[in-house]
Amino acid sequence: MSRVCQVTGKRPAVGNNRSHANNATKRRFLPNLHTHRFWVESEKRFVSLRVSAKGMRIIDKRGVEVVLAELRASGVKV
């Protein structure tokens, strides 16, 4: 399972760890992903989405029905 938010599209970013001596070593910054079940009232069922914390905020603000409609329109199977 890839580490990508289904709502925002956030994915791991690449950067550097920096030591006290300012040495750089490669690292990945992972998105804050959670598998979360959302109740969809119109379908009378739960839908599981892998979303970041920002994705959950978007769903809270706009509503799960609207976000699901956009996901399905873009070709995501939900």
Curated annotation (Swiss-Prot):
This is Large ribosomal subunit protein bL28. Signal peptide: none annotated. Keywords: Ribonucleoprotein, Ribosomal protein. The keyword Lyase does not apply. GO terms for cellular component: cytosolic large ribosomal subunit. The keyword Transmembrane helix does not apply. Residues 1-24 are annotated as: Disordered. One of its GO terms (molecular function) is structural constituent of ribosome. InterPro entries: Ribosomal_bL28 (IPR026569), Ribosomal_bL28/bL31-like_sf (IPR034704), Ribosomal_bL28_bact-type (IPR001383), Ribosomal_bL28_sf (IPR037147). It comes from the Bacteria.
